């Protein structure tokens, strides 16, 4: 490897941004084809290409950061800023859904019956499955913090246990949310209540799945001795993301499930 006179990472040319963009194109167009023509071919192709891109791009980042030493302190600082800005953009993404919900619920139109929830909508009991989901996510926030402190203290076994528990809680949350959707007395087609409910909680559910996958990758890396007590930004980013998902759920629970019902 050539001598480098600075602490910054000059990234090598990579095909993965291009394959990722093609995968995104296939996913969006494939979803439209699925809706209109009931064909899953394009959507499946997009999913496969996306998974291959994710695997190979992450593999390259792990090589560069863990084995080649490119993730120096200044590079890690840049990655931290990047993750903070990404989470900030996600905050505004969800802010749009909350805005739509409160716009519809604080001044319900005559078409909705002048009340909220709209006439004819049977809401979910906030003190049943939604409350259990809240407890599950809060518990997962505790276990991911346990994992973080274990990494910093060099407690390898405890880190693996805590991460495994966090991932299991994440998948349990997804299962409960899926059952709730299946048994819900209204659909996404039931006016503004149905659309705001399913879009907001659905995108949150997608973020839980992404966060669980992120943590699963961290668990595999921890098992393979990739993290040290000083060098573990991959896990740190996953933990930040998971705490963000927790906080969004608390706002969803209070706004849509409890106040909105």
Curated annotation (Swiss-Prot):
Residues 1-15, 67-72, 153-155, 224-232 are mitochondrial matrix. Residues 35-40, 106-128, 184-190, 257-261 are mitochondrial intermembrane. Its EC number is 7.1.1.9. It catalyses: 4 Fe(II)-[cytochrome c] + O2 + 8 H(+)(in) = 4 Fe(III)-[cytochrome c] + 2 H2O + 4 H(+)(out). Keywords: Membrane, Mitochondrion, Mitochondrion inner membrane, Translocase, Transmembrane, Transmembrane helix. Component of the cytochrome c oxidase, the last enzyme in the mitochondrial electron transport chain which drives oxidative phosphorylation. The respiratory chain contains 3 multisubunit complexes succinate dehydrogenase (complex II, CII), ubiquinol-cytochrome c oxidoreductase (cytochrome b-c1 complex, complex III, CIII) and cytochrome c oxidase (complex IV, CIV), that cooperate to transfer electrons derived from NADH and succinate to molecular oxygen, creating an electrochemical gradient over the inner membrane that drives transmembrane transport and the ATP synthase. Belongs to the cytochrome c oxidase subunit 3 family. Component of the cytochrome c oxidase (complex IV, CIV), a multisubunit enzyme composed of 14 subunits. The complex is composed of a catalytic core of 3 subunits MT-CO1, MT-CO2 and MT-CO3, encoded in the mitochondrial DNA, and 11 supernumerary subunits COX4I, COX5A, COX5B, COX6A, COX6B, COX6C, COX7A, COX7B, COX7C, COX8 and NDUFA4, which are encoded in the nuclear genome. This is Cytochrome c oxidase subunit 3. It comes from Oncorhynchus masou (Cherry salmon). The gene is mt-co3.
